[in-house]
């Protein structure tokens, strides 16, 4: 089916699914008769039979048989093999009627009574919670629900029926309804409202809110699908999450009519004795985790669900079990109380994520199988974070973790052909998805040789040269970078304009040489249109000598300022170790929008001055993040520019800064490795979304990763406790006469150092030097931004200690750099805009700090990201406020020259048009 309905399992039937399966048994590669390998020797013993004779037989004896006897024996063998092949095909057909999506059964029901069709839709909707489009599996799941609790079965069935009827009434796509895609959210709504009800079973008044809440699911599904279809994404269980979260938040534990279960945050360190862990209960938690997808904690119910999954798809059953195991292990890794693990509450989100990535929306290969395991692990920790955050407002986590984690992994872009995401219109079940993938792959392989035929002879031109470079690049080392073709992408990862852009340009983020280098006098002379006098005199000779020496100085400076492109070009033929070292240094400096390895060295030096342990943790984060990007086949020019390293360095630094275990707690390096490995995935996913508006991702991957880690562990975690953060509960005692101006001035470099979590003024001063080497304009705006943050803090009576420690300046620093010449061309208008953005970021930082402290979380660089993105989305008719395309962003000085050259070309074209018009 070609309609783009977004959902966990699109109803689009692979019309050739059954034919493909049947073709496996009837294709020429499976011959029904064994051809005679020696037709010239009809009366002689076959060579293969010589080894089968007994040793007492004479080797020289020739076995002779009559021709009709041999023909009869051959015909008997053919008949026997034909009958065996027919039995095989019949068995395959019989199994095909019950497994997969039971397409034949749905076709048979088309002309039957509407009531029978509706029952089929409800059963499919029941199974669609687990990505199963099979009414037999739905029936078995109903049996499992009855084993758990008949009352829950009633409410769940009612939710499915009401949701499906509402979709019919709203005129939703009939094929989607027939596949149960408008029923599974209603099933979960009915079940979970009964599970979290504080009233006893068979509280019949509960059916009213179940009915109304389930009716909202098709509306939410259709609305979300309108948004997600832009990225060809399913809506998963987001309608259920939205509906149930709103219901539980609206009623709560103290509601008179519909009280819900009381959910409270953790307030003490759990008492865990590892010797008390019971292995049988851990093993039992595997089927229980599968059952918790439907809110069931009975292991027999979970076992019945696994049987239902196996009937439709053994691969789904396998990944469900694997996902449950991964969730269990993740819970043990962060010292979760055993009772929570035994009840499967850490596993159900992992079950769904592992199924979704492991063959459902990605074609199953060993690469996507590993990706499914990583997604399940990421989902487990995200669930812990969301659970702790939502417990503050008394709401359970639902399946938010599954939805968010899986969507992130589906937005991943990669150059690895083995990680193949299916179009939603082709998604059915893992086995059929793999057949579709192999069919597409074989078709592409068949077209590849024919594409170089003589019908389209190559023609000279730039496109041919680009194509030849792309072909040659496939045979080069992973670390080989063509620096002459690298284009600065300004912290945007992922494929711009998705597949179309990938096909047109295999390296969409090439790092192009800027129009001029910093302090390039040649270009300055050309842009100023300096005319040299032709007559030779002493004055002109002096001037030419000064110009020549200036050129030499400029050339020398260009080797260490700007982006140090010459360094990258010089390393392209060197050892991969040196190249990787260069990438790590650039990633370290990219936090401050600087693509310069020398600046990276100075920044690492400053980190060691601050705290060697923090420097070790930060460098490890950069290395792991960069390596992960290489493994995921991300764009190599982006890796070489450090775009996949800067989030990793921030993750490593801030996890060490907020650790309550002190310095040199070596076990902390394990979560640092895991969390920094997630940064390239988040960068790629966010880049896929933000490319629609030509926006950078900034430090959003770092913010998401560290916020989830701090929320998942918290202050009371046994293994990885974090710093306790509490909201303000009293008015601060501020005496304005006690303000110390020297400490306020010192807060300017400290605020710059706080970008990396450092409060040492010497470290901040070293960072300023690192910025000045690459770009004086970046250094200037960093100082201005820190100053604006300090002044904004004084205007709202912030305690002096917070100001002295630079906590009010680091977000303003980044915002001022981003707007003041980096993504907008520097003019006096954009300079004022940068100051305004710095002020906005400072006040937004205060707001977010107060809000996140309720959950025990720091604001990180959320204020910078949100304020800078807001200002980059600004539209204006003022030509002096010029936002650069991301493909042209390098550093402020080069950005300014690019803008002036564009303006000069534009004016020249206008003059030419005017002159042509005047002549005519």
Curated annotation (Swiss-Prot):
Compositionally biased residues, Basic and acidic residues: 47-57
Q: Which residues are glycosylated?
A: 733
Instruction: List every stretch annotated Disordered.
Output: 25-57, 446-467
What are the GO cellular component annotations? Answer: apical plasma membrane; membrane; plasma membrane
Q: One GO molecular function term?
A: urea transmembrane transporter activity
Work out whether the entry's keyword set contains Transport: yes
Chain segments annotated as transmembrane = 151-170, 176-196, 204-224, 233-253, 272-291, 302-322, 346-366, 370-390, 392-412, 600-620, 638-658, 666-686, 695-715, 764-784, 803-823, 832-852, 854-874
Q: Spans of biased composition, class Low complexity?
A: 26-39
Q: Which UniProt keywords apply?
A: Cell membrane, Glycoprotein, Membrane, Phosphoprotein, Transmembrane, Transmembrane helix, Transport
What GO biological process term is on the record, naming one? Answer: transmembrane transport
Which of the residues bear the PTM Phosphoserine? 477
State whether keyword Phosphoprotein applies.
yes
Q: To which protein family does this belong? A: Belongs to the urea transporter family.
Q: What is this protein called?
A: Urea transporter 2
